């Protein structure tokens, strides 16, 4: 996921933290943001992965990024990610004549989370199904898709964008984490997702934005 130029206070990537401890984001504003080699490596991998998906989709003018972090392993694993995306796109074509695919799509979920936005690595929309795919280059912690709040927030943003254009009744979320040989997929009905958004999510997001709660 390419980092937006503006950082959301209640980011999707930190949702697991502020949903559990709503006052945390406001407290963290008092501490300077820092980066790490792992984070910089992840940014480089995401940029390379984005380039390869664009190329696979026929966008030959999309510029190839350069980074000192690029290596044989990164080349191989971003190839795997690109291949997986194309497999899912081909799969979507079996259920819809002309499915929509978007790469590094800015998603606005501020209807539920104050000033909430994020960037979806890949979004595929077909009849009745929305598929959100997130590329994780980290190898320290295995990430699962089941009830993953980051993925659910991305899904809400995509539904806000495409829900009136497609008859979507199910959301599929996938974590693609190649350095841990992890492809984790989870499916949730749109009705269930919206119930969570309008109850637990909204309540805790409002508390977190105000720096309240416990």
Q: Where do the PLM segments sit?
A:
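Metal-dependent nuclease catalytic cores that hydrolyze phosphodiester bonds in DNA/RNA
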Residues: 1-130
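Cysteine-cluster motifs in flexible loop/terminal segments that predominantly coordinate metals
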Residues: 21, 25, 207-214
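Mg2+/Mn2+-dependent nuclease catalytic core
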Residues: 97-212
């Amino acid at each position: 996921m390419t980092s937006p130029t503006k950082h959301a206070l209640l980011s999707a990537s930190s949702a697991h933290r502020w949903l559990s401890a709503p006052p945390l984001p406001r407290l963290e504003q008092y501490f300077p943001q820092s980066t790490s080699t792992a984070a910089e490596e992840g940014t480089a991998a995401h940029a390379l992965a984005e380039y390869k998906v664009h190329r696979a989709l026929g966008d030959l003018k999309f510029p190839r990024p350069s980074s000192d972090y690029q290596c044989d392993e990164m080349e191989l694993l971003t190839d795997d990610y690109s291949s997986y995306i194309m497999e899912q796109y081909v799969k979507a074509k079996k259920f819809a004549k002309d499915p929509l695919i978007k790469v590094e799509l800015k998603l606005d979920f501020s209807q539920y989370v104050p000033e909430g936005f994020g960037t979806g690595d890949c979004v595929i929309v077909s009849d009745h199904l929305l598929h959100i795919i997130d590329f994780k280059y980290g190898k320290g912690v295995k990430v699962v898709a089941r009830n993953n709040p980051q993925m659910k927030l991305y899904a809400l943003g995509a539904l806000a964008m495409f829900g009136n254009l497609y008859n979507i009744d199910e959301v599929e979320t996938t974590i693609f984490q190649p350095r841990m040989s992890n492809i984790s997929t989870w499916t949730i009905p749109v009705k269930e997702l919206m119930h969570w958004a309008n109850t637990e999510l909204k309540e805790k997001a409002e508390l977190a934005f105000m720096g309240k709660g416990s």
